[in-house]
C-alpha cells in the first residue's frame, strides 16, 4: 500500500531542527568576571537550550497527527525516533561548548548554586517548570559526571500544584442507553482531517460496544451518565485513539461507577474508521503499555494526562504513565522515587529475582515491588550458550536499541540509570556479594552505599517457565499462544531473539507475554533464515543463522499439549517463508501492522 504524501513530509527536518545555541550569550558568559552576572547568564544559556528543546518537542505531536491523517507511516516512525533522541541531543549540543569556554565550570559549586537560583526564579510561573529544572539537572550531571539523584519535582522550588485530570477532560452529559449521535459528536470533536469510511455506522457500533461493557455495572434505561473524553489525540505508528471514561452517578442501590474508555482509530485507504472499543482497565494498560512505542499526545498538559492514565489504569505505576506519552526523564525520576518509597514502606531487602539465574544479567527485586533491577555481568556464567560474548557495553547498546524502537507490544521498555547510588542496607547479603564479585566493572562500594555505573529497571514479570508451573490449563494455553504473538510482533519490529528460550520471556500482571532479556537480540534483517535444505548447522556460515524448524525445541515448553497448542496456533513460525517474507517487508521500508489490543474488541462489521 502506498500512503498519500502530505505536504508537511518534506518539512519534518525543518520543524524538528535544533536551533544553534545563543552564541552571543555564550560569549557574554565566557567574558564576564562578575559572579552574579556569570550566574545570571549561565541560567539564561541553559534556559534558552531548554526552550529550544521544548518548542521542538511540542511540534512533534501535531506532525504525528498530520502523518496519521496522510497515512504516511514512514513519517510516523521517523517522528518517534526524532522525539526519543531530542532531549539528549539538545544537552549534548551545549555541554562541549560550556566545557570549552569555561573548563572550571564543572567544579564551581558556588556558581552553580547562584545560577540555579536564577533559573528557578525565571521558570517559577511556567507550567513546565519541573521539566525545565529536570533539564538543568541533566545538563549539570553530564558536565560533572555526577551521581544520579531522583530530584523531587513535586516539592521544593520547582514544584507546581498537584495535577488533576479534570482540567483536560471534556464532559458530555447523556442518558442511557448511549445514543450513536453522542459517539458521533465525540468523533467529530477529535478534529481529524480526512473522510470517514462510515462515521454513522461506526458510531452505532461503538455505542453498542460501550452499552455491552456497561451491563455489569447495572445500568438502567433513562439513567443519567457522563462521558469524559480527554481533549487530546493520542497518535502512534498506524493508529490513533481517544481516551476517557463513562461515569454513572451514585444512586440509592449503586455507588458511583466508572468505565474506562478507549476508542481506537485507523486511517485506511477508504477513510477513517473506528477499529475497536476498549472498556477494561487491563486492556487499556496493554494498549498504553511501555512495551509499545510512545504515544504523541496533542495536549501539552503532561501532568494531567499522566494522572488521567493512572486513574484509568491504576495497576500501572504513575511513573510509567509519563514515559508512555514520551516524557521519559520525568518517568525516570518517578520510577526511582517509587522504588525508594517501596523500600521505605515495606522494609524489604533487594534480593535475587525469582526464576532462573541469568547467564548475562543479575536481576534483583523486592517481593512487593512492581519493578525488577538488573546489571550486566562482567563475564557470562558457564551456562552461556554462545561462543563469543561482546562485552558489557555491547549488551547495554542492545538494551538502548530496544528503548529507542517501537517495541511492538511485546518487549519491555528499559530505564537505564548511570552513576546511581543505593544504600548498602537495601541489599540481601548474598545478592550484595554476587553484585560485587560478578559486577566489578559496574558496581563499587563507597561509604556504605553501592554505586552503579549502570542500572537497568523494568516492570516485574513472572518468567514464562515459572508461570506455566502454577497456571491453570486455560491460562497456560493462552500464555504459550501469546508467546507466539510476542515473537511475531518482535519480528515486525525487526528484532530477532537468537536465544529463543522461554526463560527470556515473562508474563505480566495482565497475563501478557513479553521478551525482557536483550543480550541476544539482533536485527531480523541481518539474520540468515534457512530451511531444511540448508547446511546442517550455523558453524557452516558466518553471522546469526536461524532454522525455524528447530524453534519449538528451544522454547522449553515441556508439556506436549502446550507444544501442540503453540504449533497449531502459529504453524507459520516454523516455516522459513514466514521469516523471509517479514525480512523482505522490513527491507522495503514497510511498517507492519501490530495488534495493540485483543482482536475480540474490534468492531464487527
From Swiss-Prot:
Disulfide bonding pattern of the chain: none
Reaction catalysed by this enzyme: L-seryl-[isocitrate dehydrogenase] + ATP = O-phospho-L-seryl-[isocitrate dehydrogenase] + ADP + H(+)
Keyword terms: ATP-binding, Cytoplasm, Glyoxylate bypass, Hydrolase, Kinase, Nucleotide-binding, Protein phosphatase, Serine/threonine-protein kinase, Transferase, Tricarboxylic acid cycle
Single GO MF annotation: ATP binding
Family annotation (Pfam families): AceK_kinase, AceK_regulatory
Localization, UniProt: Cytoplasm
GO biological process terms, semicolon-separated: glucose metabolic process; glyoxylate cycle; tricarboxylic acid cycle
InterPro entries named among the record's database cross-references: AceK_kinase (IPR046855), AceK_regulatory (IPR046854), Isocitrate_DH_AceK (IPR010452)
Key word Hydrolase present: yes
Broad class of where this protein is predominantly found: cytoplasm
Residue positions of the active site: 413
GO CC annotations, alphabetized: cytoplasm
Residues bound to ATP: 353-359, 374
Superkingdom: Bacteria
Entry EC number(s): 2.7.11.5, 3.1.3.-
Keyword Membrane in record: no
PANTHER family given in the database record: ISOCITRATE DEHYDROGENASE KINASE_PHOSPHATASE, PTHR39559
UniProt record similarity statement: Belongs to the AceK family.
Its job: Bifunctional enzyme which can phosphorylate or dephosphorylate isocitrate dehydrogenase (IDH) on a specific serine residue. This is a regulatory mechanism which enables bacteria to bypass the Krebs cycle via the glyoxylate shunt in response to the source of carbon. When bacteria are grown on glucose, IDH is fully active and unphosphorylated, but when grown on acetate or ethanol, the activity of IDH declines drastically concomitant with its phosphorylation.
Name this protein carries in UniProt: Isocitrate dehydrogenase kinase/phosphatase
Lineage, top ranks: Bacteria, Pseudomonadati, Pseudomonadota, Alphaproteobacteria, Hyphomicrobiales
